[in-house]
Amino acid sequence: MTRSYRITLLPGDGIGPEIMAVTVDILRAIGRQFDLNFEFEEALIGGSAIDATGEPLPEATLATCRNSDAVLLAAIGGYKWDSLPRSQRPETGLLGLRAGLGLFANLRPAAILPQLVDASSLKREVIEGVDLMVVRELTGGIYFGEPKGCFADEQGRQRAFNTMVYREDEIDRIGRVAFDIARKRGKRLCSVDKANVLEVSQLWRDRMTLLGSDYADVELSHLYVDNAAMQLVRWPKQFDTIVTGNLFGDILSDIAAMLTGSIGMLPSASLGAEGPGVFEPVHGSAPDIAGQDKANPLAQVLSAAMMLRYGLDEPEAAARIEAAVNQVLDQGYRTGDLYSEGMTLVGCKGMGDALLAALESPVSA
């Protein structure tokens, strides 16, 4: 029986339209194989939305996203809009989208593909076999805490302050997401905090420990954030799933991303309690190569795989896409960001064609 899904496409800026076009072709091919009907609707966000409407997130875009089963985003931003006030820049469209959809959990996988192990700056024996997931809380912590501000004190010196605050319900909901993901992966969850000096982190640790009693099959551990950062570089294979707050997750997820050696390969997902999630590559809009058929579409394609797995509960279709990505890398196809001597250099469209061929091949099944 055919299963139908409404997907909002947000190509955005820079290389976004190019990598989105490849990904839509892949999803259509997957739909034929797995009897899935995707109803795609494209909408504006970021710089392209500013140019067309004057706003980085038009109300029509948010309404379309809310009416969908999942949102696939490509890239936002570019030099063209850097002179705008911060509150009007393209990136605020993404913040508004997350808030408008109630997204609070950011999933950032970092898996070392065997074909690209030498792209990492770490030694092969350290990095080989790494497959971890960082679950970051998105809507609380020091980025959103009140009060905050900047003022001149009695001596005329400028002072600035922010507030790091979490409620127990905010901690519990991100904790349950992380425990559920860990249960489906390696059944190991490391909670990262700074409970030795921060009261907010002590509450975080207490709530995670309490939640752990509901997940007896998941091994829970705790690390202070400074030690966690060190351990990610020293021996990343010790981690399976990491859960942490907004600030710490912002830092640790970027460390984890660079373990792989290429940010052009990394997908991400942002999820809420209900409604559609947003699935997007970690990389930016790369305006310097936009329109030149040089972009690497693999992170966008893998974001579509995450959409299938975490947004639409279609894990077999997701695995098929991931197998196709592995197959084209095995065959030596590389875009410019991954190219090395002896490989076959292809552009964005060429990589898409190779992926489509792999999907039709029984080798990737």
Swiss-Prot record:
PROSITE patterns with a match to the protein in the record: IDH_IMDH
Cytoplasm listed as a keyword: yes
Full protein name: 3-isopropylmalate dehydrogenase
Residue ranges that the Swiss-Prot or TrEMBL entry lists as coiled coil: none
GO terms assigned for molecular function: 3-isopropylmalate dehydrogenase activity; magnesium ion binding; NAD binding
Family: Belongs to the isocitrate and isopropylmalate dehydrogenases family. LeuB type 1 subfamily.
Pathway the protein acts in: Amino-acid biosynthesis; L-leucine biosynthesis; L-leucine from 3-methyl-2-oxobutanoate: step 3/4
The entry's keywords: Amino-acid biosynthesis, Branched-chain amino acid biosynthesis, Cytoplasm, Leucine biosynthesis, Magnesium, Manganese, Metal-binding, NAD, Oxidoreductase
Binding residue positions for substrate: R98, R108, R136, D226
Catalytic activity: (2R,3S)-3-isopropylmalate + NAD(+) = 4-methyl-2-oxopentanoate + CO2 + NADH
Subunit structure: Homodimer.
Pfam family, one: Iso_dh
Cofactor: Mg(2+); Mn(2+)
Subcellular localization(s) per the UniProt record: Cytoplasm
InterPro entries given in the database record: IsoCit/isopropylmalate_DH_CS, IsoPropMal-DH-like_dom, Isopropylmalate_DH
Assigned EC number: 1.1.1.85
Keyword flag Manganese: yes
Enzyme superclass (EC): oxidoreductase
The protein's role, per its UniProt record: Catalyzes the oxidation of 3-carboxy-2-hydroxy-4-methylpentanoate (3-isopropylmalate) to 3-carboxy-4-methyl-2-oxopentanoate. The product decarboxylates to 4-methyl-2 oxopentanoate.
Cellular component, GO annotation: cytosol
